[in-house]
Amino acid sequence: MRESCDRAAVVRQRDVLWSWLPLALSWMLMAAELPALGAVVARLADPRIHLAAYGGGVFPLALIIEAPVIMLLSASTALCRNRASYRALWRYMMVMGGALTLLHVLIAFTPLFDFIVNRVLHAPPEIVEPARVGMRIMTPWTWTIAYRRFMQGIQIRFGHSRLVGFGSAVRLITNLSVLSFGYFIWKGPGIIVGTAAIAAGVTAEALFSHIATRPIINGALCTADSGLPDADVGLRAFLAFYIPLALTSLVVLLVNPIGTAAVARMPRALDSLAAWPSVVGLMFLFRCSGLSLNEVVIAMLERPDSRSAVGQFSRRLSLFVTAAFALVVLTPLGLGWFTAVQNLSPSHAQLGVTALFFGCVLPGATVLQNWYQGQLVYA
């Protein structure tokens, strides 16, 4: 079996690179959707209101609801060793996705939304109704992400990382198609165009992941012999394994609603929230190289003498992305990105550049965080 042969060889940095690259490209394709959304919404009617509605309402709420399913990718990569473990994890994924989707519906379609947005986030009144519409359109978001991350973990474990990149390409193409329709033909409200594009993209990616993973499930997964003991995927063991991972992503993603609530209480709140999606989008483009490392570490550490090569690769990658991000922040490239590509007003663009200074260490730190996190998950 290919998997067994790969594990028998000593790992070199080149091996880590070729394992990481498809995932990194996948994350970059996914990261491109937020700048694309910002660029289109900024060119439709009332861009200040609709960008702020997405950045200050829809995005932080949808992200925090989704947070518990983020680490299904790591769990699937680590635990889906055979048909029995696949079936157990599939049930857990469906329960989590369904429960969190129900929570999303309760927030988006009941007065709970008003309490959270007005009282907790303290959002400017102008963005409340557009944000409500956007949250309702984003209803498929959590379940589809849970499903595709679970399937992508299986793809990574059985040596088909390139399928993750293909899925991200499907997502981006769908996203751009909806954005193009909204901008060139319909010219509707920016919040509707943007959130419809995001929801359609993740749904298309989940469908592709389902189709692409079926041959693996019916083939390699059924006959898998990883050389490792069977994973204990009983409910109690799974919760003991997964709850720390879910709490990690929850704590990390809590930064978004906490940051939104803080910004909404400061001077120039509406302007800051309008610039926020473009700032987050650019930072995410640089951080995704580190976010894609976690599953590579988990998979590589099962091979002999791999720790040194993976660790050295992680340190070099951290230095590289830090230098690349600093180049954008400390030169006119940053201002040019916000004005020419994102179509922000000069005042919003200057806000964005100032914000980037405070995030200079994040891309490199994200790489190192995922190197250590991958080791903990493997252990």
Residue ranges and their predicted role:
Residues 53-104, 148-156, 275-329, 333, ...:
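Small-residue-rich hydrophobic transmembrane alpha-helices
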Residues 49, 87, 132, 161-162, ...:
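Residues that define the loop-to-transmembrane-helix transition and helix capping
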Residues 21-74, 243-303, 328, 359-366:
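Transmembrane helix-bundle signature of multi-pass secondary active exporters and lipid flippases
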